[in-house]
C-alpha cells in the first residue's frame, strides 16, 4: 500500500482482505470467490472491469515489459462516496516499453504480432500469470477489451495515423501535426 501514509490497523486489515478477495476471484477459474462471511462475489465486485481493460490495452499496445508486474498501480474508491472498487490507474513507468526492450522469456518485443501483457508471467515461464495476464483469461474482462479496442483504441489509432477523420479528440493530434 502506497498511501495514505498514516492508516489504522483496521484500515490495513480491511484493504488487505479486500485485495486478497480480489486476487482470489482473479485467480479462480470462474472469476468468483467466497469471502470470510461466506458470501460469493465476482471479480467485478472488487475491481472496475473497464479501467482494467483500458490498462490492459495500453500495456499490450506499448509492449510494456513491466505490465502487471512492477510499476502497476491500483487505487480504491471510497465505499461511502465512490463505487468501492479498485481501479487500474494511473499509468506509470514505460522505460521498458515501446521498443526499449527486445526480448524476455522467449517473447520478441520487436515482433508486432506477439502478445505480451496477455501471456506475461510473474517471474519466469514456470510461474503464474501476473495480474494483467490473469485478468484477460476471464471472459468478462476479455470481452470489455475487445469492445474498447473496436470503439475507442482503433478509431484513435486510425486518427493518429491520418487514416480517419472520424475521431473527435481535442488532445490527440495526427502524425501530420508534428
Residue positions per predicted region:
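Intrinsically disordered or highly flexible coil/loop and linker segments, enriched in small
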Residues: 28-32, 62-67, 141, 154-159
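C-terminal catalytic region of ATP-dependent kinase domains
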Residues: 2-12, 16-19, 23, 36, ...
